Amino acid sequence: SAVQKITNLLGGHGDYRLIVLAPSSVQEMHDFAALSFELSDKYRNPVMILSDGRIGQMMEPLTLSDRKPRTVEKDWALTGAKDREPNTIRSFYMEPGTLEETNKRIQKKLKEIEAEEVRYESFQMEDAEVMFVAYGTSARLCKGVIRELRGEGIRTGLLRPISLWPFPSEIIRELSDKIKSIFVVEMNAGQMVEDVRLACRDRVPVHFHGRMGGGVPTTEEIITQLKQTL
């Protein structure tokens, strides 16, 4: 799917994924920098912080935490110690079947990441009939839209994926049984809407609004388009 294609930005033809974190504030830009190192050390897997341009240019107060890095046992790392056991790190094995077994171990690790590292934020979803799904700047805009629509008696809420991989498919599927429709907002032509449709499995209609070329959706246009779907 589209967002999962983004996770393979480093190129290559192997069966792998990157952990992808999508910040929605300056605070999260700071926090995710530390988190990404912890996750990459824990799983020996690359992590991408996928921020849009608006977040990158934003000025906000943030709290610098006293967070101490988690120590992770890394038996694969070189220590430089005298008389240590030799440790050769390779990604390609010529022996028949060896590379496939290595790839099976990687797939097992990716399944563990999918089970343990899904991150998302739920906003006013307790009684929502329409669910926005958005990340980054688009998610911030949707919160303002939700407050305005609720003032008009239209019950809306937001599911914000924080991890674009692993994607919060299961929670989207569960919430799809409780709502009437989904409205995806992005600052592109629709890179996540495909994942949302796959997650909800045709339980409810999925609508989309996006702006391209650095354009930012406005509250007015989101509300206008959403009302056309009701």
Where is each model-derived feature located?
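Peripheral docking tails and interdomain loops at the edges
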Residues: 186-230
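Short acidic, glycine/serine/threonine-rich loops at helix termini
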Residues: 1-2, 31-34, 58-65, 144, ...
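Conserved thiamine diphosphate
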Residues: 1-52
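Conformationally flexible catalytic loops at phosphate/diphosphate-handling active centers
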Residues: 44-122
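Redox- and metal-dependent alpha/beta enzyme cores, enriched for Fe-S-associated oxidoreductases
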Residues: 119-155, 159, 165-171
